[in-house]
Swiss-Prot record:
Principal EC category: transferase
Name of the protein in question: NAD-dependent protein deacylase Sirt4
Location of the active site: 152
Subcellular compartments: Mitochondrion matrix
The Deacetylase sirtuin-type domain, residue ranges: 28-312
Gene name of this polypeptide: Sirt4
Keywords annotated in UniProt: Metal-binding, Mitochondrion, NAD, Transferase, Transit peptide, Zinc
Annotated positions binding NAD(+): 53-73, 134-137, 251-253, 277-279, 295
Annotated transit peptide: 1-16
Pfam families, alphabetized: SIR2
Protein's UniProt keywords contain Manganese: no
Record's cofactor remark: Binds 1 zinc ion per subunit.
Reactions performed catalytically: N(6)-acetyl-L-lysyl-[protein] + NAD(+) + H2O = 2''-O-acetyl-ADP-D-ribose + nicotinamide + L-lysyl-[protein]
Major subcellular location class: mitochondrion
């Protein structure tokens, strides 16, 4: 039987806007007064720092983990790979890379949505200092944002666990393809880290290259669950908070501490925090302004009817 026949499962299309919205949780229409309130909040803070989570990428067709009814925890019993499991188990590494290989073409083809593009525009207009993102999808960079810090790393880089070797994920995909010619059909169900679900019988024969420098094991440059954000990155973000005049959180429940910590650092400096997210967040009690809405209904509409600031 052909691999393509066995790889069929729940399939979704990212081609239409309707399909892209299927990963967006149920939400109410935005109140226009809320957009005005957020504009006023930002107008007095030209050096605001933006923290983004998976909620801004759901409108691009990448599901988050936790959203009720549409997140991956609601759709599947499969849990994300743990860092120590990946490091210690060759079977876990093989399973991860097989799924990631199949899902990569779809994941890497995902395009920024209106919120990503709006944030890139705000940076050009000097309305925001930078973007700190919990996402690994590089959509901010694709949209044109230049000052981006990826808290949890990037799915677009592969690193060796034993030395400093790095390789671009697209190049690594070509190597995997040459080693595994049978895996040519790509399922459509994407996890936030590019992972997908495929039959176990095909994972057993999947081949993974070793590091060309030292023969070590290769891993995406992503902070897996159970791992810690590198200290230099934590310190870099803390410095950005210190140099900001406020924080705007977009599309994050802030349940992961690496994101919540940024809010705590901001409030420790007695700086204001704004939040736009569908549903509650861990930091609602700390927010100076909270809007429960889809980011795409709010952020692209900001400053629409105001003259852009002149940028030298």
């Amino acid at each position: 039987m052909r691999v393509g026949q066995l790889l069929r499962f729940r399939s979704t299309s990212l081609r239409s806007s309707t399909a892209r919205q299927e990963y967006v949780p149920h939400h109410k229409p935005v109140v226009e007064d809320d957009i005005k309130r957020l504009e006023d909040f930002l107008l007095s803070k030209p050096n605001v720092l933006v923290l983004t989570g998976a909620g801004i990428s759901t409108e691009s067709g990448i599901p988050d983990y936790r959203s009720e009814g549409v997140g991956l925890y609601a759709r599947s019993n499969h849990k994300p790979v743990q860092h120590m499991e990946f490091v210690k188990s060759s079977a876990v590494r093989k399973r991860y890379w097989a799924r990631n290989f199949v899902g990569w073409p779809k994941f890497s083809a995902t395009q920024p949505n209106a919120t990503h593009h709006a944030l890139a525009r705000f940076e050009r207009e000097e309305r925001v200092q930078a973007v700190v993102t919990q996402n690994v999808d590089r959509l901010h960079t694709k949209a044109g944002s230049r000052n981006v810090v990826e808290v949890h790393g990037s799915g677009y880089v592969v690193k060796c666990l034993s030395c400093e070797y790095r390789i671009d994920r697209h190049e690594f995909q070509s190597i995997l393809a040459s080693l595994n010619p049978a895996f040519k059909d790509a399922p459509d169900m994407i996890r936030p880290d590019g992972d997908v679900e495929i039959p176990l019988e095909y994972i057993e024969n999947f081949r993974i290259p070793e590091c060309t420098q030292c023969g070590g094991d290769l891993k995406p440059e992503i902070v897996f669950f159970g791992d810690s954000v590198p200290r230099p990155r934590v310190d870099q973000i803390a410095g950005m908070v210190y140099n900001s005049d406020g924080l705007l959180v977009l599309g994050s429940s802030l349940l992961v501490f690496s994101g919540y910590r940024v809010v705590l650092q901001t409030k420790d400096l007695k700086l204001p925090v704004g939040i736009v997210n569908i549903g509650e967040t861990r930091a609602d009690h700390l927010a100076d302004i909270k809007i429960s809405a889809k980011c795409g209904d709010v952020i692209p509409k900001l400053f629409d009817f105001r003259n852009s600031k002149s940028v030298s």
